[in-house]
Every structure is written in structure tokens, then in C-alpha cells.
């Protein structure tokens, strides 16, 4: 049991007065209760005054004293972070969802006392291992339910979205998780979920925050192990290194990988009604999913306690701001930190208990000697998100690491919006200035130096970029272009003004994937014979695997047994029908995405059970959505976390973020521009594995990671880098042969995708008139072949030429147009939302 530290509560009455008068005692208790209610009501009303006093958490003497203490702590640390540099860690990186979620499932199952989870979005129905039909015990809610029933205390903070703008439905998350252990059942009360911030001051008296989000993604287990990175525990994130687009399985829908809402393409359609997680309005037989590329890591060591402290500070801030008079939510205390630093309050009449963590004695000395990885937590936090003065140590870390780089800076990020100075308003963060400084210094020293940036081709929001509704998306793209290479104040513009050729020093790339939907003649014949549509069979399968007994459907979302019965009957009838009009001697794979990696086959060698026209209809492409937030410099240092490269993530007082700086004291003998070099094991191998994936030098992944050391926890086995002679080309990041290969593959892949699909955005589209001419005909579905008349043999031969997923970022897209029009949705008041 947790140590419950009871606060001092005012005695309800003198013992000598009531001891022999039970009737008077009851009256006095009622009067005392009424007094408490009046005090609470008075304070609730008093909070309305905060509307006109945005500094209300920092204007009293005791609050200013706490601010002073926090500032002194931060000023004594590198990057002015709340956390110091700490040594002696074990660390493990995870690239893409399979490895990360596999390891997370292992860790959650091992929890004995306490779990902290912070997410922008959390889907209780998410399967951490695949395929779901064979991994029924590996769903998030089933794991958390088991741990809660075993006595583990689970604390979760999720972003409370503005419902008009986002569809993640945190209310469903909260109610679904709270109802896992109803009153009277084992584990009741062991799962507590907070939603923050509020958007209505009259709701619970909390501050109103409309524009900014809790964007962190991290998990702490028993104060011994932590996960941190770019992956929310939610739909749409689970993926493999080959980044498949297809999930159609003629043999049996039990082989489906992404059931229900988990199959998503944000460029075509945003998530819809996620509380009805079994359904999906995006047809798997017509459209490919949007693959998801991400990076995270797990650590053991002293910095785990810093992540725990960040969580507890956020929890107590939300408790004070929103749940102060809700007895279901306790104040959290930590053994190693003072209450005032943690934001713990001791009101006269407290509601909820005071719980001190961890529940077991800490051996800090042992935690500091586990390995040789040095780490430091950095964050973006401020008054609205954390109850503190603004901290932007993530931006400080980015700037310092970039300026100190001697050989290269490699960035993967969801966005790239930054300024080189004060002349790019409304953009404020100056990471761009640090990039200019690093390149300028290298140029003056005649030193080879490269900045390589990989970002999505287009932000992951639904809609045709020509539509008025896409004005916000175009605004983001416009800010990115003006940060990178458009205008005299962009990074490239500043460099040109200094007489420096930017092409020599900085390059921008993206990722794209292809696949073939496995809608075969066999499926069509089955539909004819049974009268059951394949989409209905998929819905039935999703209903079966996502509606296990003992797992609640959440707030108001119970199961309809009659509907379920008929759905399962249809599915059984469809799958029992094994008749064939004619035998097929061709093997048809459910996905051919693996052919872009180190595979034994190429697309031209793939068989298909159907005619050529049907196969052509099934060939699709989509951008591989880069959601990673990674910076690596000189094979020495890495920054990984939740922070995008834009104002929202970097300023501190907009979105809240948490990232970690990694420096591994384990070194490897390496090369840098042909010279002998001592590289950091962690940073060098993270970069190499990312580049091998992007260049197609890795083999595809299986769904099952049970024997893969890349999906284990820190300290439980080394990586398997699957190296061969060809893949070693990435070892020297400044190798000219590598750079030639990188650019050639990006160029070739870009041209092939352009010829086959006419993908938007593209350098051939400089005006909206070009856009109209370039786009496929209206009857061509999004992501399908541009020219249906091209012979199949020619299509597949061209696909053979695609290696990996690397493509060039289109620097000239709509260069002759004003991309963002000022109006109601985009103006001086709202423009900071898009930066």
C-alpha cells in the first residue's frame, strides 16, 4: 500500500465539549462540514478572478520564493534545465512502432508498484503486439487492468483536446480506463486519469487554455525504468520498418494488423468517432494507410527519477488547477524532492490524500552505476502547463548542440519552422540561427560539414491543398519553406547573402512508401457467392478482437450482442467459402512493401491472383509520415523526445514537451570523412540504423518480435544491427560514396514516384494552375496510379527501381503562389497556432 501522509486537519471540536454529548457532536460535525463546503465554494468563486490575473500563481511572496528556488536550480544546470547531467545509465533506442510497443508491453507487465503515463492521445484499445487476433492479452486496457488488479497504482495524464479542432476524444480514454475496475471489483480506484487543460473556466474553475497542448509522450515504471520519445500510445502509430500500406488478407481476416480505427490515413481522412474504435470509414480495399516513422528510447538510471519528477509536478499542477476539490485525485509527493518544488499544496481543508513515492527505498548509488550512458532531461514547460516560470531548455539544447557540431547535424522532425533572427515574425525560436552559425563557422574554416533534415512531404492533415479548408496546412508549409529556403531571411537566404552556397552544406529530404492492396479476384468471387462484403468481414473481425470479455467499451459504449452475433455469422460464412472458379498457381502476398528494403524479391517478380487491370488498381503510394523528433550531431550526441522543431514545441510557454539528451561513454572505432574517429555507441548506431532503413539496406521486419533483441529492455541484450558489407556504407557519415548513393536514391525514387503517381507536393507544381494539370483525373482515387493505361509490366519494372523510402523534399512546390491567405482561420491573432 502507498504511504498515505495525512495532512493536518483542524479539529472539528474540543473533546471536552462533545465527549459526553453525541447529539451535540453530530450537530457540530454537520456545522463543520457546512463550513468546509462554504470555504471550498468561496475558493471556487475566487478562482474566477484568475481570468483577469494571469500571474496568479506567481504574485504572492511564497510563490515567488518557490520560483526563485526553481530558477536557481535551473541556472546551475546545462541548458538551464530543471534536471542536471546524470551518468551511469542503460539506454536503448527503438525505431518505429513494433520494437517500441513490444518493449513497452514487456515493461508494463513487469510493473509491481506504480505506473506513470503522459500522452497527447492514449487509445485504451490499442494492441501493443500484432496481429491482434493472436495477441489478445497485449491490448493496453487489458494490461492496465491486470496490473491494477494486482495492486499497481496507475496515474495517467492526457491532453484534454479542443473538441472542435481534434478528434482524439480524451473523455473516452478517461472513462474507458476508469471503468476497467468498477466499484466492488479488484483494482477499483487504482487507475486514475486526468485530462488537462480545461477550456471553460466555469467547468471546474481551472484556467482556460485553447491553443496549447500537453504534447509529452513518456512512461515511468516503478521509478526504475522510463520510456520517452515521439510515440503516443494510440491508434495509427504501430508500424514496421518496411512501412506497409496494405492490410487486406483474402485467406483470413484474422491476419489483419490494424483493426478498426487503427488503420488510418490522415491525409485522406482524419480519425472519426474514435470512441467507436471497432469501425473505420476508410476502406482498406480502396486506400492505403499512411505509414508512421518514429523514434523513442528506454532508460534505466537516475534520470528516470527526473522524468518521474516532471510527471509529479504536472500531476500536482493539474490537481491544483482542476481537481483540487475532487477526492479521487491525491497529491503526489516524492522522497527526494521538496513539496513546494513539486507543487504540492497543504490547504486548510484538503481533499484527497498525500501519497509519497516511491513505495520502496531508493538505492540512488546503484542507479548511478548501471551503465555508461550520460543523460539529461530537457523540457518545454510554463505556467499554464506546469505552474512554473517558462523553461525552454529543449531549445537551448538544440541551439548549443548545433553550434558545437564539427562534422554534421542530422535532424528528423515532424515540422521545421524556425527563424534566423528577428525579421521572420511571427516565428520566434532561433534554432535556424544556430544552423546558420554552424555552417558559417565550418565554411570559414574550410571544413566539410553537412546539415541533413528529414521532414514529412506535407503535414498530416486531411484535405486537398487547393481547398479553403486547407489554409491552415498551407500556412504551416509556407512557414516551413520560409524557414528553410524561401526569402532572404531563410537559412539558405542568409547563407547566400554571406556568399556561401547552401547546397554544399544543407539538404532536405522526405520519405515515401508504396504497396499493393491485396484485393484479389478471390475476394470478389467470395463476395458474390456469400452476399457478404469484405469490409463487413473486417468490421466483424475488429469487433471480435477489440471487444474481449472483461474489457469495458468505456463511457456509454457497451456491446450489442445481437449485432455482434450477425457480424460473426457473416464473417464465418465468408471465410468458410473456399470454392475457386479457377485454380491459381501464383502466390499473392498481402503486402509487397518489403520489396523496397533488402528483400529476396522485386515487385516485377511478385505474383497476383487476378488480372492485370485489377492488380494495377491495387498499386498505391503514400508519404511515410515522419513523426520522429531526433537530433544527432557528430556521432557523439543525440536528443530524442516529443519536441517538434517549431515555436509550439520550442518556446516553452506553448505546447509542453519532454526530451532527453544522450551521450554514451561507450565508444566505437569509426571513420569521419575517412579519418579515424571515436564515435559514441548510442548516437552512431542510432544514425546508422535510421540511414540503413531509409536507404533500404535493412531486411523487412516480422510481426513477432519475441526473438529480436532490438525489442528488449535496456540491459536485456544488445542490438542486432543486421549488418553486411553493403550496409556498412553508412558508417562514415561524411563519406562521399555514401553521399552520392544517398542523393542518387533520393533522386531516382522521387522521379519514379512522380512518373507513376504524380504525388503532391512536387517541384513540377509551381502554381495552382500547375496543380490542376498535374493532379490525376478526378475518378482516380487518392494514392493510386496516375495513368491507368500504363502496362502493368512497365509499372512493376519502375517500382523495381525504388530502393528504401528516401525522396527529395520539394523545394519549389507552389513557389509562385501566395500559399496562405489571411482570413478568419489564419490572421494575426491565430498565426501562432501554425508556427
Regions found by a protein language model. Give the residues of each.
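Long, serine/threonine/proline-rich intrinsically disordered regions in eukaryotic cortical polarity
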Residues: 2-59
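N-terminal alpha-helical scaffolding segments that mark the starts
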Residues: 24-27, 58-59, 67-75, 82-85
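HKD-type phospholipase D/PLD-like phosphodiesterase module
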Residues: 71-114, 118-401, 412, 418-419, ...
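Ordered core of a single globular domain
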Residues: 413, 428, 435-436
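Compact beta-rich and alpha/beta scaffold cores in large eukaryotic transport/transcription complexes
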Residues: 456, 654-656, 662-666, 670-671
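Long mid-to-C-terminal assembly/interaction modules of large eukaryotic proteins
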Residues: 515-516, 524-526, 532-549, 558, ...
Amino acid at each position: 500500500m502507498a504511504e498515505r501522509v495525512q495532512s493536518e486537519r483542524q479539529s472539528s471540536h474540543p473533546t471536552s465539549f462533545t465527549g459526553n454529548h453525541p447529539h451535540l457532536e453530530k450537530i457540530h460535525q454537520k456545522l463543520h462540514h457546512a463550513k468546509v463546503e462554504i470555504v471550498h465554494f468561496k475558493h471556487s468563486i475566487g478562482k474566477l478572478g484568475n481570468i483577469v490575473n494571469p500571474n496568479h500563481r506567481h504574485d504572492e511572496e511564497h510563490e515567488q520564493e518557490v520560483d526563485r528556488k526553481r530558477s536557481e536550480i535551473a541556472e546551475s544546470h546545462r541548458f538551464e534545465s530543471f534536471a542536471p547531467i546524470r551518468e551511469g545509465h542503460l539506454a536503448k533506442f527503438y525505431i518505429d512502432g513494433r520494437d517500441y510497443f513490444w518493449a513497452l508491453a514487456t515493461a508494463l507487465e513487469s510493473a509491481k508498484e506504480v505506473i506513470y503515463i503522459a500522452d497527447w492521445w492514449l487509445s485504451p484499445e490499442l494492441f501493443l503486439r500484432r496481429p491482434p487476433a493472436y495477441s489478445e492479452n497485449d491490448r493496453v486496457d487489458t494490461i492496465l487492468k491486470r496490473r491494477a488488479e494486482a495492486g499497481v497504482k496507475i496515474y495517467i495524464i492526457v491532453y484534454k483536446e479542443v473538441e472542435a479542432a481534434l478528434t482524439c476524444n480524451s473523455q473516452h480514454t478517461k472513462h474507458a480506463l476508469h471503468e476497467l475496475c468498477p466499484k466492488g471489483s479488484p483494482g477499483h480506484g487504482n487507475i486514475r486519469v486526468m485530462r488537462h487543460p480545461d477550456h471553460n473556466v466555469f467547468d471546474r474553475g481551472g484556467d482556460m487554455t485553447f491553443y496549447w497542448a500537453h504534447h509529452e509522450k513518456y512512461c515511468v515504471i516503478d521509478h526504475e525504468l522510463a520510456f520517452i520519445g515521439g510515440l503516443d500510445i494510440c491508434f495509427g502509430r504501430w508500424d514496421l520498418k518496411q512501412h506497409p500500406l496494405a492490410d487486406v488478407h483474402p485467406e483470413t481476416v484474422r491476419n489483419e494488423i490494424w483493426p478498426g480505427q487503427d488503420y488510418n490515413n490522415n491525409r485522406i481522412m482524419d480519425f472519426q468517432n474514435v470512441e467507436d474504435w471497432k469501425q473505420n470509414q476508410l476502406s482498406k480495399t480502396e486506400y492505403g494507410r499512411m505509414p508512421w516513422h518514429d523514434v523513442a528510447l528506454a532508460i534505466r538510471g537516475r534520470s528516470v527519477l527526473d522524468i518521474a519528477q516532471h510527471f509529479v509536478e504536472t500531476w500536482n499542477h493539474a490537481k491544483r488547477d482542476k481537481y483540487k476539490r475532487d477526492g479521487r485525485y491525491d497529491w503526489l509527493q516524492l522522497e527526494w524532492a521538496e513539496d513546494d518544488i513539486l507543487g504540492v499544496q497543504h490547504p486548510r481543508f484538503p481533499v484527497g490524500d498525500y501519497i509519497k513515492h516511491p513505495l520502496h527505498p531508493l538505492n540512488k548509488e546503484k542507479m548511478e552505476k548501471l551503465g555508461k550512458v550520460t543523460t539529461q532531461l530537457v523540457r518545454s514547460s510554463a505556467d499554464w502547463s506546469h505552474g512554473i516560470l517558462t523553461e525552454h531548455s529543449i531549445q537551448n539544447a538544440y541551439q548549443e548542440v548545433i553550434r558545437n557540431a564539427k562534422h554534421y547535424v542530422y535532424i528528423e522532425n515532424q515540422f521545421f519552422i524556425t527563424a534566423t533572427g528577428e525579421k521572420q515574425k511571427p516565428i520566434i525560436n532561433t534554432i535556424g540561427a544556430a544552423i546558420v552559425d554552424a555552417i558559417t563557422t565550418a565554411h570559414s574554416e574550410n571544413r566539410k560539414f553537412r546539415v541533413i533534415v528529414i521532414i514529412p512531404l506535407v503535414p498530416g492533415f486531411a484535405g486537398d491543398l487547393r481547398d479553403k479548408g486547407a489554409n491552415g496546412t498551407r500556412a504551416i508549409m509556407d512557414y516551413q519553406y520560409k524557414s528553410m529556403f524561401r526569402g532572404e531571411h531563410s537559412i539558405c537566404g542568409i547563407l547566400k547573402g554571406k556568399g556561401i552556397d547552401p547546397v554544399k552544406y544543407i539538404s532536405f529530404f522526405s520519405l515515401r512508401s508504396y504497396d499493393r492492396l491485396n484485393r484479389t479476384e478471390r475476394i470478389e468471387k467470395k463476395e458474390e457467392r456469400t452476399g457478404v462484403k469484405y469490409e463487413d468481414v473486417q468490421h466483424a473481425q475488429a469487433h471480435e478482437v477489440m471487444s474481449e470479455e472483461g474489457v469495458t467499451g468505456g463511457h456509454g459504449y457497451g456491446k450489442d450482442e445481437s449485432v455482434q452475433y450477425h457480424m460473426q455469422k457473416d464473417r464465418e460464412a465468408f471465410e468458410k467459402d473456399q470454392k475457386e472458379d479457377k485454380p491459381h498457381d501464383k502466390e499473392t502476398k498481402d503486402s509487397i512493401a518489403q520489396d523496397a528494403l533488402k528483400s529476396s524479391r522485386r515487385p516485377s517478380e511478385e505474383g497476383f491472383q487476378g488480372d492485370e487491370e485489377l492488380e494495377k488498381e491495387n498499386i498505391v503510394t503514400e508519404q511515410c509520415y515522419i513523426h520522429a523528433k531526433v537530433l544527432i550531431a557528430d556521432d557523439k550526441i543525440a536528443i530524442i523526445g516529443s519536441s517538434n522543431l517549431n515555436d509550439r514545441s520550442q518556446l516553452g510557454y506553448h505546447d509542453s514537451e519532454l526530451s532527453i539528451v544522450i551521450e554514451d561513454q561507450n565508444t566505437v572505432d569509426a571513420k569521419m570523412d575517412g579519418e579515424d574517429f571515436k564515435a559514441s555507441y548510442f548516437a552512431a548506431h542510432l544514425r546508422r540504423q535510421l540511414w540503413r532503413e531509409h536507404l533500404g539496406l535493412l531486411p523487412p521486419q516480422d510481426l513477432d518480435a519475441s526473438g529480436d533483441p532490438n525489442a528488449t529492455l535496456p540491459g536485456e541484450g544488445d542490438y542486432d544491427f543486421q549488418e553486411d558489407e553493403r550496409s556498412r556504407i553508412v558508417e562514415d557519415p561524411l563519406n562521399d560514396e555514401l553521399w552520392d548513393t544517398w542523393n542518387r536514391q533520393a533522386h531516382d525514387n522521387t522521379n519514379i514516384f512522380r512518373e507513376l503517381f504524380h504525388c503532391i507536393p512536387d517541384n513540377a507544381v509551381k502554381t495552382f494552375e500547375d496543380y490542376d494539370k498535374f493532379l490525376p483525373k478526378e475518378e482516380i482515387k487518392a494514392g493510386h496510379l496516375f495513368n491507368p493505361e500504363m502496362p502493368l509490366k512497365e509499372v512493376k519494372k519502375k517500382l523495381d527501381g525504388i530502393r528504401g523510402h528516401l525522396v527529395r523534399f520539394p523545394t519549389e512546390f507552389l513557389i509562385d503562389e501566395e500559399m496562405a491567405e489571411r482570413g478568419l482561420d489564419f490572421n494575426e491573432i491565430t498565426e501562432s497556432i501554425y508556427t
